[in-house]
């Protein structure tokens, strides 16, 4: 699957400090320690109702990760998937009277357009579930062979499930207790009451073919992949075990990321799926959770059609720390627009205060668990000094503009 167009990054003199990120599994901020090439997998969209601000906040988070790693001298092998085979997609297509493939293609193209407008650096590999079905089939065969998976006793629909007890460390990523897992499993696409399962928390690996649903051939019977196994297969086949960062929204911690890791660790024993599990907070609207069911999604494409500068959307989302749940309001957007205007006014000056210390602080704050609020404040301080008192460094405005572009993804 084709990604979106790349964005040229300005070169900022020197190199940024090593990146430190909060690891959900370890419950602490610790160094990211990649080799020359950093490896990162981020869970992509299910292509309907794209791209709302919750999506945007997640992909901006990992865009910052990408930029900070590059600024630190690393190449970045970034993989992102698209869940273009899933029940919510089929349900939306049926509701709207369109083919699910047509709906998926349309929403994926809109997502690409939104990401390019927000100046999100594209993944090196952008992989759809449909194009990776054969990989999933091979993965399920391995899980069946080593006893980590089983077929339910159902002659009509012999679905294949993952044994939750296949790994001793299951649950290490989320740290949730059994009661919390049971509640979230039911709320987030699980099927705890499916007859024939050995444990209510066992997760679907392969859904046997049903009338009216798409299916693909497999040695164990035609069907389609479960949700979690798609990411396990795509990530392992492109990045290998113990890649540097798995990322997504905090609503993916459980069940999706917990099971993706468990599937992989059942095949590659003794090695963690990823070295860092990193999760972005959720975005609400005017004091309420933003969700499809509430009908209060704010779409990037709608804001763009209304004439909102994508750079302001980006600044508005970066004004809160990535790990915190936060609200989108008119006041947030107005503040972002005002900040963008001030930054552009200051960097358009013929001279300004020296830029070196500001760029160093910008780098340091971003390397410290992506502290974007402090990073924005560092630029604000330079801008205020430039507008209020001027300066004699003729290269400073351009240097600040290039650093803001390269590190924050905001073109001034």
Curated annotation (Swiss-Prot):
Organism: Nocardia farcinica (strain IFM 10152)
Cofactor: Zn(2+)
Binding positions (Zn(2+)): 43, 231, 256
GO MF assignments: ATP binding; cysteine-glucosaminylinositol ligase activity; cysteine-tRNA ligase activity; zinc ion binding
Annotated Gene3D superfamilies: Anticodon-binding domain of a subclass of class I aminoacyl-tRNA synthetases, HUPs
Chain positions of motif 'ERGGDP' region: 187-192
Protein name as annotated: L-cysteine:1D-myo-inositol 2-amino-2-deoxy-alpha-D-glucopyranoside ligase
InterPro entries found in the cross-reference section: Cys-tRNA/MSH_ligase, Mycothiol_ligase_MshC, Rossmann-like_a/b/a_fold, tRNA-synt_1_cat_dom
